[in-house]
Each structure stands twice: as structure tokens, then as C-alpha cells.
């Protein structure tokens, strides 16, 4: 499926690094390195604007290597880029690591996955919701061990 893009100066198209990759890497479109202190977050430009086909979204996800080795992740993971958004794709990175992390120009900072979207119709139900074995137990209360 084709996703048409516009690139700002220095921007690069998302790129799949292997034939079986689900996510295409996004690069930091910055001129100077950015120091991300432990606990700090930053909005990183990619220099990419996308025309996402209707009925799809781009999900912005962390790169596993950055998360494992440095504690760097996408704060609102997965971030959603809606099909009607035409602004620059930017990535909210946060440093959960113990040391300062340097984001270098052109560094691969996140990945995007093209995903289908199904919109629900939300309706107020006049009678009680159907009962389940789980009931209202949430946040670690599935009953599974």
C-alpha cells in the first residue's frame, strides 16, 4: 500500500530495514544533537508529512534496541497519526534510563506501522450490560495466574 509523503529539508522517508519488518524506521530530523536527561522528554521532528489512506493510521512505536539498551521509548506508545492529519510527524521520546542519552541527527528514533482502523458506533444500552466471569475486575484482576 502506498503512503505519499512530503519531506522537509533534511527529512528522510521511513525505511524498512529487513524484508520481514513490520515497522519502518523514523529518523530524527535535527541539525544538532539533543541531550535527553534521565526522566526528561522531548518532541523530536522527523521532517515527514504523510497522506495516510482513509481507513488506516500510522502507529508510532518505540525501537526495541533503544528501549533495552538505553531506556528510551515513545511516551504515548503507540502514538496515532490519523489519516486526516497533514502536519509533520513528530515523536515524543522519554528517557527512562539512568544516564543522559544523546539523540544524534538522522538517528533512528522510532518506527511506524501502517494499521487498519475500525470505527465503532457507541450506543447507550438501556438495560444492564451482559454479565461475564470477569465482571468489573480490572488492572491485574483477570483471574488468570
Swiss-Prot record:
InterPro entries assigned: dUTPase, dUTPase-like, dUTPase-like_sf, dUTPase_trimeric
Keywords: Hydrolase, Magnesium, Metal-binding, Nucleotide metabolism
Residues at which substrate binds: 63-65, 76, 80-82
Molecular function (Gene Ontology), one example: magnesium ion binding
The enzyme's E.C. designation: 3.6.1.23
Tagged with keyword Ligase: no
Keyword Metal-binding attributed: yes
Catalyzed chemical reaction(s): dUTP + H2O = dUMP + diphosphate + H(+)
Pathway participation: Pyrimidine metabolism; dUMP biosynthesis; dUMP from dCTP (dUTP route): step 2/2
Transmembrane parts of this sequence: none
Its job: This enzyme is involved in nucleotide metabolism: it produces dUMP, the immediate precursor of thymidine nucleotides and it decreases the intracellular concentration of dUTP so that uracil cannot be incorporated into DNA.
PANTHER family in the record: DEOXYURIDINE 5'-TRIPHOSPHATE NUCLEOTIDOHYDROLASE (PTHR11241:SF0)
Protein name: Deoxyuridine 5'-triphosphate nucleotidohydrolase
Organism, scientific name: Chlamydia pneumoniae (Chlamydophila pneumoniae)
The encoding gene: dut
Amino acid at each position: 500500500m502506498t503512503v505519499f509523503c512530503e519531506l522537509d529539508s533534511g527529512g528522510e522517508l521511513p525505511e524498512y530495514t529487513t524484508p520481514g519488518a513490520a515497522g519502518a524506521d523514523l529518523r530524527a530530523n535535527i541539525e544538532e544533537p539533543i541531550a535527553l536527561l534521565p526522566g526528561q522528554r522531548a518532541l523530536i521532528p522527523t521532517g515527514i508529512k504523510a497522506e495516510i489512506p482513509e481507513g488506516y493510521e500510522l502507529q508510532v512505536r518505540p525501537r526495541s534496541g533503544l528501549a533495552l539498551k538505553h531506556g528510551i521509548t515513545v511516551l504515548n506508545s503507540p502514538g496515532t497519526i490519523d489519516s486526516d492529519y497533514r502536519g509533520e510527524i513528530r515523536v515524543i521520546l522519554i528517557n527512562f534510563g539512568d544516564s543522559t542519552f544523546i539523540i544524534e541527527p538522522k538517528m533512528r528514533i522510532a518506527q511506524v506501522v501502517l494499521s487498519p482502523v475500525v470505527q465503532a458506533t457507541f450506543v447507550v444500552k438501556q438495560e444492564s450490560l451482559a454479565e461475564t466471569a470477569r465482571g468489573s475486575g480490572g488492572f491485574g484482576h483477570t483471574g488468570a495466574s
